[in-house]
Amino acid sequence: MGTTTWIVILLLAILIAFIVGYFLRKSIAEAKIQGAETEATKIVERAQVSAEATKKEALLEAKDEAFKLRNEVEKELRERRQELTKQEGRLLQKEETLDRRVDSIDRKEEQINTRDAEIAKRKHQAEELERKVEDLYEQGRQELVRVANLSQDEARAIIMDETKQAAMHDAAILQKEIEQKAKEEADKKARNILSLAIQRFAAEHIAETTVSVVNLPNDEMKGRIIGREGRNIRTLETLTGIDLIIDDTPEAVILSGFDPIRREVAKMALEKLVQDGRIHPARIEEMVDKSRREVDERIREIGEEATYDVGIHGIHPDLVKILGRLKYRTSYGQNVLFHSLEVAHLAGMMAAELGEDVTLAKRAGLLHDIGKAIDHEVEGSHVEIGVELGTKYKEHPTVINAIASHHGDTEATSVISVLVAAADALSAARPGARQETLESYIRRLERLEEISESFDGVEKSFAIQAGREVRIIVRPDVVDDVLAHKMASDIRKKIEEELDYPGHIKVTVIRETRAVEYAK
């Protein structure tokens, strides 16, 4: 074959390759276009699914947000309803209080109107009496002039003297009636005020003892507390002034002493020593000093709590600390601080009923026994010491007078002083408030019967009602009815002179005469 033939074949091959490449490229492009269209369709479908999911998620979030918002709104509405309910309750309570006050004012107004009517009636009676006196005076004057031929001046003098005596007699009777009625009304009002104050206030009281108990982890600790040859227990007793009683009581040590502050210091120190485990004289001295400082701080806090409880302020810090010491002071088993708080509240309630200064009454009631906090350290009665403290720390004159007069040592110069004395008597005389040792109680009853039986004609005497009444049986052949009254008065006077007792004692003399005959 020639060259031309190869050239033709080569050209044909190139042409065929071009044609095949063209169609192959076209088919590949179509395949890519179809794949792109398929992918685009898938993307659109995925976008639609994603959009639908996003739409649902947004819808759920919107519903959740709406639900939360509705819950918050409902919660706020409930809170507002509760607040409105509380406000409505407070308004109803205030309305009831106002109604009670209105009723009280109405009753007082009725009493005033009744009293005014009574006064007007008595005034009218007095005017009538005055007219009658004038008529009688004129008649008497004319009669005297006619009968005795007296001058007008002499007749006037005689009639004026008689009229004066008659008027004074009538005025005395009227004055006695008015005083009696006023006394009855005052007694009734006082009983109402006292009963109202008592029923409005209820205080908690605890029985005070002279011992404290410290619990131990085991009985081996007792030996460590005693120490070698008893040096530890001697050191603790010397530093605190408290007796330690270590007996067969399991896992316990008893602290005995009549000073509650020292006993509290000893208790705290011993508890710290037991907890620390190191018990020797130097450590004991360190713990006692630390406990004494803690007790002093606790006393100050107790005083501040007492003033806060009563609602008064402005008391000198040193006086507040002295007030806190009353927590560790008792009188006939009654805690003096609790007693002072009770007196303060009672005095404040009674002052409110009488329209007096409630805050000043509470202040006077809280401080009325302040002298008992240091009466074992300073010479003088607790009243004298209290007056000195009130004067030293510049208390109100009414408070000082209430301190001085609450036992009748000084005359009360204000209504608040009288209220404090009444509140003090209420708190002390309330059943269960104060205790009395069995020995002194029995001795007082025996002495009461001895005084009663020291009079002639007494057959037997009996002290009853816990010593608040004594009944004396007398011999009827020795003591008659007249002498029985005199004997009751004499026994009463002798009891007042020779016996110390709380409250009052009723003396009853019983004389019985029996006539017995037997029918046969």
Curated annotation (Swiss-Prot):
Report keywords, A-Z.
Cell membrane, Endonuclease, Hydrolase, Membrane, Nuclease, RNA-binding, Transmembrane, Transmembrane helix
Q: Which GO terms describe its cellular component?
A: plasma membrane
Major localisation: membrane
UniProt keyword Nuclease present: yes
GO terms classed as biological process:
mRNA catabolic process
Q: Indicate how the chain sits in the lipid bilayer.
A: Single-pass membrane protein
Give its E.C. classification number: 3.1.-.-
Q: Where is the KH domain?
A: 210-273
Enumerate the transmembrane spans. 4-24
Q: Name one GO molecular function term.
A: RNA endonuclease activity
What compartments host this protein? Cell membrane
Which residues does the UniProt record annotate as the domain HD? 336-429
SMART domains under this entry? HDc, KH
Q: Please name the top-level EC class of this enzyme.
A: hydrolase
Record family assignment: Belongs to the RNase Y family.
Q: What role does this protein play?
A: Endoribonuclease that initiates mRNA decay.
**Name assigned to this protein:** Ribonuclease Y
